[in-house]
């Protein structure tokens, strides 16, 4: 029996022992060393050969990732680690650090209970470190810290033991400041990364060594020894004395929770159902014999097996051949194969129980974030939808070069939308021109070149990237009448800006899109009031959609309840295209103040009510001082001081605003905010301006008003592009 086969047998046994399972992720800023760390953990556990680790990047098993040298999709693997004479099952997920792939990070966080946050000793805490930490804490995932690339502080920056400790303390303090700011109230103190108890490790993933304070005490290695090993180029010996996988996995087992502990506080956070119900209690207890409840965290497309769903189970168990029910898509499915992940391979097992991460085939309609349960005990409601900190901000139009490829292209686009819910796909079968919206240039490039070109074998023409704008209002409209085509139904409404605190709660995911078919639910009302909406309005909200809401302030109109669903549909159609450039509207509250309907139901059907509301909403928005909003990115540039002026000039030339500047040694850090529309070609330009000596990163920072002097020009460009008549 080979080493891997033994490992599989051990995994099967340990899957049933909850206190010996750790579901953990590795997350960090791009290039801080996540995948190298993952590989060396796998090598230490005997999953891949030690010689290949680091170069092999076992988790970067997609050709595109290997070519770019960055992790694009989150990969999963299960392995066994022995600690204090006991064996533990570690389910490990490696997540991408590149800002364009933030969606994968969000989805991975739903599957795990703890995370090793990797931070580069040279660069320190970077914007993406903060973003992944925010995602983790929002999902109640407990963090521990690994400070990587310590050898560079010694060999390149020549730091003394005192300076080394100073640098570590600064990074730890910054991470703890973020944890204090963003952690759930009850964990603000408990979850701080404390060096003494061993919640922080230091080392070099590339050279395969790490230490922590408890490990130093056990092994007698000091900071001075580490400096000697690095300076004398004996990091191999150091790796024998302080192996990376032992230190990191010991830290994970000691400080990260097992599924039993974690589900007690994670379930109420991600599931809003009745905690006293059978299934509620079963999930909190992580009961393998309870009703089935799980969430799909990722869809992986395998050339042979088709769509594979990575799934975290919170309750019950899945066996091969079980009938399943997908709550979001309201579809039945069957578990054709049940397996565990071993990097790029999957190993079939007879069944998987609560607290584990597994691979399922047969869920054809599943999307990332889908709730899985049994058809005999449907989980109502499903799990909270996955909210991302970024939004798609760039769109490209693509067309198949060959018309015969059209049906296949449409199929692939639908598949991409299922796999990655940060991609928006609009399929236009009439014109053959399809729109893909993504998080940034790289995200779009990977979709068009890799997913469509390489995997799908379809040649496509890709249009120029288009920036996604939004529209909102700055004033209140007069009372507007929306009339049905037959003139027998009239609805009166006012458009006004949504309360700032309520819109902020929407952006943070505290309130979300929802139609209240009969009346506002108690839970929905409570959340709206908490967000700052007046109680009287909160209990009259009919629908929240794309960051807009409609509130029914009428009284005693009998037919209104019958027409409620049609009014909601008309409202949605009304805010899909704004008056300035037919871009989506956000941040608008429509107050319905009066209505008259024809007595005869035949004369107040969908063909009458929907257009009446749609025209009314559009007219009200047009008369409430509409403005264009453009997507912004926070841009961080880390550059030698000699090039600081060039870096700032590059930002200023792109309508950017410098928000903050810091000096650190001979490096300058420039923090700025730049419109996405001005960011095309930035990578090449900033490298040229600083002769390739700078590090830079961007992340989406929301929408802001387009400067008044530019608005007419931009609106005209968008209208011309869409073939709309100029206003």
Curated annotation (Swiss-Prot):
Tell me the ranges covered by the tr-type G domain, including all copies.
19-260
Instruction: State the protein's purpose.
Output: Catalyzes the GTP-dependent ribosomal translocation step during translation elongation. During this step, the ribosome changes from the pre-translocational (PRE) to the post-translocational (POST) state as the newly formed A-site-bound peptidyl-tRNA and P-site-bound deacylated tRNA move to the P and E sites, respectively. Catalyzes the coordinated movement of the two tRNA molecules, the mRNA and conformational changes in the ribosome.
What SMART domains does its record include?
A: EFG_C (SM00838), EFG_IV (SM00889)
PANTHER family with a match to the protein in the record: ELONGATION FACTOR-LIKE GTPASE 1, TRANSLATION ELONGATION FACTOR-RELATED
Q: Where are the transmembrane segments?
A: none
Which GO molecular function entries does the Swiss-Prot or TrEMBL record give? GTP binding; GTPase activity; translation elongation factor activity
User: Which CDD domains does the UniProt entry name for this protein?
Assistant: aeEF2_snRNP_like_IV, EF2, EF2_II, EF2_snRNP_III, Elongation_Factor_C
Spell out the subcellular localization from the entry: Cytoplasm
- What Gene3D superfamilies does the database record attribute to this sequence? 3.30.230.10, 3.30.70.240, Elongation Factor G (Translational Gtpase), domain 3, P-loop containing nucleotide triphosphate hydrolases, Translation factors
Name of encoding gene: fusA
**Residues that bind GTP, according to the entry?**
28-35, 94-98, 148-151
Superkingdom, taxonomy of origin: Archaea
Family per record: Belongs to the TRAFAC class translation factor GTPase superfamily. Classic translation factor GTPase family. EF-G/EF-2 subfamily.
* UniProt keyword terms in alphabetical order: Cytoplasm, Elongation factor, GTP-binding, Nucleotide-binding, Protein biosynthesis
What SUPFAM superfamilies does the record tag this protein with? Answer: EF-G C-terminal domain-like, P-loop containing nucleoside triphosphate hydrolases, Ribosomal protein S5 domain 2-like, Translation proteins
A single Gene Ontology CC annotation of this entry is: ribonucleoprotein complex
- UniProt xrefs under Pfam families: EF-G_D2, EFG_C, EFG_III, EFG_IV, GTP_EFTU
What is the name attached to this protein's record? Elongation factor 2
Diphthamide carried by residues = 603
